[in-house]
């Protein structure tokens, strides 16, 4: 069981022994995190652990997690104004049914990560207000039965077509009770 904390990093807990196996924090010698404030975690279909912190996104390689030297990978591709995703305040990580990853930030919009099957690298698209999103403060990410991605923000609900990355915004005039959503407050 992976346990995320608000100020104490992320801990792997063993049910059988009822003890913590390892805790990763900013001061860890082997695998320091960019921040001890963990906002969200996701275990994907390949057993990788995605850790969204207040200062960036890291991924713990699931295949090598229990060896003597686990591997954290920082995402560091360039975005706008020389900022990097690994410095963003990550608030939600979502794996789509097809294995793509959607990463929501507190004030920098949304990142769509798609694995390139030939290189195994992650390609990304940055979706923000300039690309049609209602607001850059992401509150929640969900996927419907038609594979549309629904993104709740501070200023409305957005439906994204993952094929074209086109965005349709829903707000008060579309029947919403409020334009501002709570963080990760949804049921599927």
List the predicted regions and their residue ranges.
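Carboxylate-rich, polar loop motifs that coordinate divalent cations or form catalytic acidic clusters
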Residues: 1-188
């Amino acid at each position: 069981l992976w346990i995320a904390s608000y100020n104490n990093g992320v801990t792997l807990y063993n049910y059988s022994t009822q003890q913590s196996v390892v805790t990763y924090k900013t001061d860890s010698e082997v695998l320091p995190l960019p921040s001890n404030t963990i906002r969200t975690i996701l275990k994907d279909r390949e057993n990788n652990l995605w850790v969204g912190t207040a200062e960036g996104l890291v991924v713990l390689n699931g295949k090598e997690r229990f060896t003597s030297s686990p591997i954290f990978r920082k995402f560091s591709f360039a975005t706008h104004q020389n900022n990097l995703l690994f410095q963003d305040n990550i608030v939600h990580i979502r794996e789509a049914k097809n294995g793509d990853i959607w990463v929501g930030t507190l004030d920098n919009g949304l990142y769509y990560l798609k694995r390139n099957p030939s290189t195994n690298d992650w390609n990304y698209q940055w979706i923000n207000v300039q690309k049609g999103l209602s607001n850059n403060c992401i509150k929640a990410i969900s996927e419907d039965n038609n594979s549309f991605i629904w993104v709740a923000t501070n200023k409305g609900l957005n439906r994204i077509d993952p094929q074209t990355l086109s965005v349709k915004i829903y707000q008060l005039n579309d029947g919403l009770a409020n334009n501002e959503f709570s963080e990760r407050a949804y049921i599927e």
